[in-house]
């Protein structure tokens, strides 16, 4: 059921309990977790934190801890499946679910006892009515009941005939109801999409309780920016949520106006920015940032010689010397940095790039540590998705979580360096895929498969990294192809996962269009294609549009997907 009063029905309920916190491996979930941790520390709430990267880990962790806890909080996992069916919990277990995955499973919505959904009702959820999905068991029992009293034979026969007619009518009604139910559930469940950032939901709770701090506000901003970076929400939703957070930024700044105007070693200041859509440019050179931003790489077609010439023309149009562009942004001439944003935007307009700036936020720690929200998203994600040889998944999770604290800026800077390598690997892989024509049309969708032995291939076996690569590849492909039909197609991408087990990670990405509602139909399509061909798949990720597949079953799985979507 949906929780209406988060403070009373959630926070005050767990306030005096020992709580188990299951947190998914995405940046928004980490930010929501940081806000909740800060609230729990403030109120001395006892909790245990368990990172989970998929359903198997969640089930295992629940079985391991269920004896010690009655209250469980799930962040960015659990809303879009029948949670009670998966976990088979004891009757006294209560689950609070704060999850951005949509649609919300109908059993979770209508379970009043064990499932408590911490989900904003303003999100357009369109949950089907209870009576359209669930039927009273007593009605079904009526169908099988037959009367056997001692009436006269003729009377009995007449009543029996009436009962048969009535039973047939009820059976027909039931069949019609079941057919309608199937259609309603299909319409409701066919697309996967995302709701309000969990970090924003948790910040809202802190604000309602008058416990919101600047740090919490920053984590809410990073959570929202994570959704924007990964194309999980529409531009309209992003701008609306930025507006909500902007009001909080103004409120916090006004409250601390005297200190904020005086920068000090200890100060933390958040500012609204209308900044450049260039990745990590303040921590890199402008040249590297232009090369490794998906928007500019796609628009200039930087995988081609012609595209690289166009980039040189773009820099010449701005009047920026190559020496300045290729050195670290921090070392650039101050006179050039002053109006750099305006210069870039003006030249970008001439080159047909209208979206070079975006509404965002920055944070400044003391005199010299300044970060854009997107810098933190890339750094944190890179720490979390580092290849396993550098440590376990839990180690990476804890390191990523730590990097969000001001006291661990060294970890954040380490994340920025990793992010640069990841972004370079992404653009090099895109260039390789486009130059060797690895993206092919399968009819209803485009398909691309990374081969074992491809440079950096281990990096793209992770779901977030592969999804980001797929989105950026699709964007670049749309600008590179002359085939109009192909520009409107979605993309399915595969990358090797485990050579020993012979498995690949497969991700499905919706079409790259300006009007896209960011809804993804691949989750259900993958499920049906696997079922119809008995392909050995593992639907282990919280995002339904990412699966593990046995490499041997790939061709029959793809054939089924083609016929399903044709």
Swiss-Prot record:
Residues 138-152 have a biased composition (Acidic residues). The keyword Chaperone does not apply. Associated with ORC2. Interacts with HELB. Component of the CMG helicase complex, composed of the MCM2-7 complex, the GINS complex and CDC45. It comes from Mus musculus (Mouse). The gene is Cdc45. Keywords: Cell cycle, DNA replication, Nucleus, Phosphoprotein. The modification Phosphotyrosine is found at residue 130. It is found in: Nucleus. Widely expressed. This is Cell division control protein 45 homolog. It holds the Pfam family CDC45. Belongs to the CDC45 family. One of its GO terms (cellular component) is nucleus. The keyword Phosphoprotein applies. Residues 138-161 are annotated as: Disordered. One of its GO terms (biological process) is DNA replication initiation. The modification Phosphoserine is found at residues 144, 146. InterPro entries: CDC45. Required for initiation of chromosomal DNA replication.
